């Protein structure tokens, strides 16, 4: 029964999240054009940079959410409500402390904003409105939404969080776009963002109370219980180091780009990362609902089932990510040129580095899921190396500019996330030969090497290899001439080479029948 329930919830996550993110992608690209035209590239760069700066403050979250989710897998599986209430109370207590600290630190940090944005054309009232608006939205996660976000995710109901969030996001972005088009008001843009963040919190917590009316989070109980649960703080300390590593890869990059360029360059960079992030979210929404499923499967302890699950998830995610990454490398700039204009196109080498980092960041997802499922957080030197790499990123930025800034994370990702972490999982988690990972990587990579070379030849034969496309019609023709052969050839080869692809295909057929 647990197996059937886990599979059912996984497919439900996939279906619902896929629909919401497809709609989100369409709305995001439509509204992004309006925001750039009406509010300007500099303002959009300001919001992106402020978000990155707040990432520094949010490091204080320490990885508590990920840690608590880990300690909820087993009690949710066993329906141990008392343990669930105790664990979520501990989270409430920790989040009360962390949220208060971040709020105070944010107020102090805001005093230095004139030094950070001294070269901008915005008034200080606009800069402070953007900063405090985004700070307020982040506070909702610490004081209001933490129970719903954590339990829904741990109980494989992440589709509810994503669904309600996307619904309010749709409404917010459409209203922001309408107001931007008619008023060009920075103030109204931020007011709408804050208002809909509040609406999302109200809806999410209403649904949470309906699904889990028995959950009671007590700050006092959490404070007392934490003294008897030292394993939680130990795990939090380990996760925190890993949170720093993620911060280097995500929040720090826009700030570093701003440090070596301008808010406008941040916008050009973020246009590409927006496209990549939307696709990344789409992939996660479709395939990321397996997070809690993996945790529950590992809790059952069947080693053969665990490895079979890893192999299947690795293969299907690799296929999807590799296909989309190669499409992005080949078509990204054409899309930007048609969507926003050629003035927003970055040099090809920068686009390639952005897309390679996109691939590496997503292709590691299966390994990360299983490491989290096993609770393996002892390899603290990995995120420490990521932090040290920040110095290399800054140094490379001084020497080679944006190329250096984007190249260093690629090298770090390959070394740490695609060599060391799989070894760590296979050795300390699944306890099987690391050679099986190299074999799995090879049989998944080979079909795409062959398929990509064949697709490039086909595209060139059709005359789509010269210059950027300038119309949607030409872009669609170029996209189809490349992506269709790539998909069909890769699928044909993967079906013959990859057992994981065949396993997933059989599962889908059985589900449909």
Residue ranges and their predicted role:
Residues 1-10, 187-190, 204-251, 293-308, ...:
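Interhelical loop/hinge segments that connect adjacent transmembrane helices in multipass membrane
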């Amino acid at each position: 029964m647990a197996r059937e329930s886990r599979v059912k919830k996984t497919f439900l996550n996939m279906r619902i999240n896929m629909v919401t993110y497809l709609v989100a992608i369409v709305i995001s690209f439509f509204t992004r054009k309006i925001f750039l035209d009406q509010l300007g590239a500099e303002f959009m760069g300001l919001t992106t940079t402020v978000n990155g700066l707040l990432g520094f403050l949010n490091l204080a979250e320490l990885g508590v959410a990920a840690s608590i989710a880990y300690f909820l897998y087993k009690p949710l599986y066993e329906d141990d409500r008392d343990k669930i209430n105790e664990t979520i109370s501990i989270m409430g207590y920790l989040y009360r402390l962390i949220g208060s600290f971040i709020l105070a630190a944010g107020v102090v940090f805001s005093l230095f904003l004139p030094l950070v944005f001294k070269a901008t054309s915005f008034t200080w009232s606009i800069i402070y409105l953007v900063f405090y608006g985004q700070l307020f939205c982040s506070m909702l996660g610490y004081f209001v939404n933490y129970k719903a976000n954590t339990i829904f995710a741990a109980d494989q109901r992440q589709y509810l969080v994503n669904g309600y969030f996307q619904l309010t996001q749709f409404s917010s972005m459409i209203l922001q776009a309408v107001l931007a088009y008619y008023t060009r008001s920075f103030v109204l843009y931020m007011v709408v963002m804050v208002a809909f963040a509040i609406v999302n919190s109200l809806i999410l917590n209403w649904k949470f109370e309906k699904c889990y009316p028995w959950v009671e989070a007590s700050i006092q109980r959490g404070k007392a219980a934490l003294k008897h649960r030292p394993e939680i703080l130990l795990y939090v300390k380990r996760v925190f180091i890993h949170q720093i590593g993620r911060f280097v890869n995500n929040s720090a990059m826009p700030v570093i780009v701003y440090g070596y360029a301008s808010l406008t360059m941040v916008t050009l960079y973020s246009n590409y990362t927006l496209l990549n992030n939307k696709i990344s979210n789409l992939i996660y929404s479709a395939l990321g609902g397996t997070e809690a499923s993996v945790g529950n499967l590992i809790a059952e302890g069947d080693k053969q089932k665990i490895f079979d699950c890893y192999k299947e998830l690795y293969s299907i995610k690799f296929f999807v990510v590799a296909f989309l990454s190669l499409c992005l490398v080949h078509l990204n700039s054409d899309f930007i040129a048609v969507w926003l204009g050629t003035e927003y196109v970055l040099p090809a080498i920068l686009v390639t580095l952005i897309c390679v980092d996109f691939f590496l960041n997503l292709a590691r997802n299966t390994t990360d899921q299983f490491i989290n499922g096993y609770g393996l957080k002892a390899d603290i030197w990995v995120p420490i190396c990521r932090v040290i790499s920040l110095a290399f990123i800054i140094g490379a930025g001084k020497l080679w500019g944006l190329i250096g800034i984007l190249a260093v994370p690629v090298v770090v990702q390959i070394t740490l996330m695609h060599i060391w972490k799989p070894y760590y999982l296979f050795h300390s988690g699944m306890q099987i030969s690391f050679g099986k990972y190299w074999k799995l990587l090879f049989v998944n990579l080979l079909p795409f090497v062959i398929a990509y070379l064949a697709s490039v030849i086909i595209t060139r034969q059709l005359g789509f290899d010269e210059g950027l496309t300038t119309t949607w019609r030409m872009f669609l023709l170029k996209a189809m001439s490349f992506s269709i052969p790539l998909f069909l050839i890769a699928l044909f080869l993967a079906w013959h080479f990859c057992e994981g692809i065949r396993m997933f295909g059989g599962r889908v057929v059985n589900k449909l029948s």
